[in-house]
């Protein structure tokens, strides 16, 4: 089975490293890069062209993860973007999905479910944390 390549964007170094470790230690997944800012993400993601990008919304700068999705999705349409955030507000959810994100999960999602969500997104699904799905449907 082909490994799913994942790129992680989060301004929190500890969380970014934890997500990278979860992905890298799991069979069938490979973390091919990380970024801590919107600028770094916009520069690096089109070069490595991952299957899935885990994208935080708040990147500690004026540009958000949603802004990054808006810029990159038209440039690399085969890459799937999944928002991974603490925000549960309707406005953020719909803004992210409108920008081109295909999934939306909360950071409190257990690691096993997060990996399932990555695979589901890669296989054409639209994974969401249950709290988010209730707001969307």
Regions found by a protein language model. Name each.
Residues 92-98, 108-137:
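Short, flexible helix-to-coil linker/hinge segments that flank and couple to helix-turn-helix
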Residues 43, 66-78:
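Short amphipathic alpha-helix used as the core "switch/output" element in two-component signaling
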Residues 56-58, 85:
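Active-site residues of response regulator receiver
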Residues 34-52:
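Acidic, metal-coordinating helix/loop segments flanking the phosphotransfer/catalytic sites
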Residues 11, 84-88, 107-109:
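Conserved active-site segment of CheY-like receiver
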Residues 51, 58-60:
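The short loop immediately C-terminal to the conserved phospho-acceptor aspartate in CheY-like receiver
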Residues 2-15, 19-23:
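Conserved acidic segment of CheY-like receiver
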């Amino acid at each position: 089975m082909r490994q799913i390549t994942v790129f992680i964007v989060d301004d929190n170094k500890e969380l970014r490293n934890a997500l990278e470790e979860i992905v890298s230690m799991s069979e069938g997944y490979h973390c091919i890069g990380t970024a801590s800012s919107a600028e770094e993400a916009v520069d690096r993601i089109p070069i490595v062209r991952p299957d899935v990008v885990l994208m935080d919304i708040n990147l500690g700068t004026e540009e958000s993860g949603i802004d990054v999705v808006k810029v990159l999705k038209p440039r690399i349409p085969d890459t799937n973007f999944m928002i991974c955030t603490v925000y549960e507000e309707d406005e953020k959810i719909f803004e992210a999905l409108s920008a081109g994100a295909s999934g939306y999960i909360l950071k409190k999602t257990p690691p096993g479910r997060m990996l399932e969500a990555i695979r589901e997104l890669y296989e054409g699904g639209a994974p969401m944390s249950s709290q988010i799905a209730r707001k969307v449907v």
